[in-house]
């Protein structure tokens, strides 16, 4: 029996195809379903206002700054409606006819075949003699942003824009190219795709030379330039039109009218719609401290730039922005009332609040030590809802409430390199991450990951707030609680619903769980996989506090699902064109520069401290010497003004001068007598010895408290007085030789005193 079965197996072979049978066709590859497509599965009909379109933008080499700002402006509902409706809204039929040539759908199978053919060609070239050895390639990471962007370019529809300025009745400008972008997305019959903003970039680089290079640009500078260019283009075209045409309002469709009533936006019939949306008014109040007169000066702004402090919030930064500033010393204020420079106090307040508030966090600061800009990784907390307090007393609607709807994030260690992404809140589909060609849904708490802490982390750079009402905020919170309660109650589902749409277990940015374990089985919690596409930060500490504090499960259902770990920042490349190793090298270099800078600052601080100590010691020595000299001069001054000194000074040098003059006069009169008695010389020398001996004798008996010099001077003065008394005696006039030798003796004394 066994031999029969073995022979039967040998006889039975694989079935041979018949001669006339056709081979079975190979099934074409199906592109993978993206998380965005899963989110849009339950969407209804396509809207005509463009609020349900989610297109990525192709990066043409460091153009992420442009893509992130354009995405934020497109999802600013009143701004998008104003751009589309000015000067008139293009009919939808014309747009659909134009999109028939500009919207191109991808052939995924053809792209795969072309990619496989390119790989074979590359391998064949490597096998040629003399060719360098082919390096083994690592398998592609399907969770990396580069792979997702490549798949998006191969599978999603590509939308190219053309110049339609003539249909608007305007000349080509940056505004018309922006209008081309917005209208193409609004009129598209596909909800997802990729825009190619090549025409917009061509106009931008043609009109502004600074954007012609492939260097890293600043997103905030581009936002400010774009808004000012839109204002200039609109006003320039309006000035060319006659007055009656400018006064006529443009035609409105029923859909646009309905949207305007619901969102609060109006179809622009003037050229000031950009000012009405983004423009605010700042008031500079300056109070003179001399006359206490307050002067005010108004200035407009399209975005508000605030300085940052470590471990602060947007509210504290705004408080510092409006803090009082003392104008003194070289920065005094010229008061017109006082007519000169005076000390004053200055502060900045907001007089008119904009409908859309663009807050620029000044992350890049110029440092004198490095002689270049440096990125500040300060932790600055920004809220979902904001109410400004630094308004003037006569401000319009000072209690206006704002809600956060877009965040532009800068990823990188410095201002000269890095990458920009945008996180935007849509009307009814929650928050989305726009990373050039890739668009993915994220959770609401994901927005809180960009407060900023240390080098290497992604930080929020520009915050977009739009006006809202308290009723809308309460309604939104109720809807979020209802959605969260529904997701918690649906335990048997395999996916967790957040923001009202189902998510797959492998979604990187939403961090959804495949199964919610019961509270009685805590050991069944599994570690979630980390996603390299999300710029990570640590979870906000307030969330942990909310989990630890007891609350009502009906209102605080967020405690049931655990907060997923934030992905590691090392897995996110610095830019789409840079590898992880290059990013690590740059970060190590920046860390080394930072440590060297800190060490140099510490050395400089020590040197400055030693110099201050030496200077302080020198000043103390000078002060002590000055005090000693002051004491000595005070004692000398006291001795001079004493009664004895006054008496001595009356018989001092002044008397000597008068005596010398009288002697000279006397000698001039008795010249003949002195000449006739020149032979008598011995007797006066014996009677009047030199004054030196007398001075030395008197120095041996000094009274207490007198110096030898002062006593000698007093003795000499006394001798002079005695000689003058002797000369004044009439009996001395009889012998001329006494007068001669006494005069000689007086000259000797005068010489000794002067010497």
Swiss-Prot record:
Pfam families: UCH (PF00443). Residues 547-560 have a biased composition (Low complexity). Residues 581-630 form a coiled coil. Residues 237-246, 577-648, 718-733 have a biased composition (Basic and acidic residues). Residues 254-270, 693-709 have a biased composition (Polar residues). Belongs to the peptidase C19 family. This is Probable ubiquitin carboxyl-terminal hydrolase creB.
